[in-house]
A protein has these predicted regions:
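Catalytic cores of alpha/beta
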Residues: 13-21, 58-76
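Glycine-rich beta-to-alpha transition loops that act as phosphate-gripper elements at the mouths
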Residues: 7-12, 32-33, 54-62
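A contiguous pocket-lining binding segment that forms or flanks enzyme active sites
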Residues: 24-27, 39, 46-51
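Surface-exposed amphipathic alpha-helices with a cationic face
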Residues: 1, 19, 40-47, 97-107
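Glycine-rich phosphate-binding active-site loops on the catalytic face of alpha/beta enzymes
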Residues: 27-36, 72-92
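C-terminal helical cap(s) of enzyme catalytic domains, especially alpha/beta-barrels
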Residues: 69, 85-107
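Active-site beta->alpha loop and helix N-cap motifs at the rims of alpha/beta catalytic domains
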Residues: 1-9, 17-30, 36
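Hydrophobic faces of well-ordered beta-strands that scaffold small-molecule active sites
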Residues: 5-8, 26-28, 51-56, 76-78
Length: 107
């Protein structure tokens, strides 16, 4: 059984190390502190092969996710904008489910 490893990287050195050990997808974290979309665009210049997954502070909004994909991100992670809610409320879980479905459909 194989395990797929997606490392979290914040520097070019870390990205190159991940690539050297065979990682195809690389999580860029924390993207909100590294410069956001501009950082990904800058990385793609010297690293056109980079299959980046930005993570950290990305809003659960279809247009924002689409923007990330349009600049070359292979996927995005969405956490805090979904999980800062009250999970004791069943409606909250349904709301999260609807948000995720919406994000996937508008890709």
């Amino acid at each position: 059984k194989k395990t797929y490893y997606i490392p979290g990287c914040a520097t070019v050195s870390e990205i190159l190390k991940a690539r050297s050990i065979g990682c195809e997808l690389i999580k860029i974290f924390p993207i909100n502190l590294l410069g956001g979309k501009k950082f990904i665009k800058t990385l793609k210049g010297p690293l056109p092969w980079l299959k980046a997954i930005p993570a950290g502070g990305i809003e659960a909004n279809p247009e924002i996710v689409k923007d990330w994909l349009n600049i070359g991100a292979k996927a995005v992670t969405i956490g805090s904008s979904l999980y800062n809610k009250d999970f004791s409320n069943k409606n909250t879980l349904l709301e999260i489910e609807k948000t995720l479905i919406s994000l996937m459909q508008k890709r």
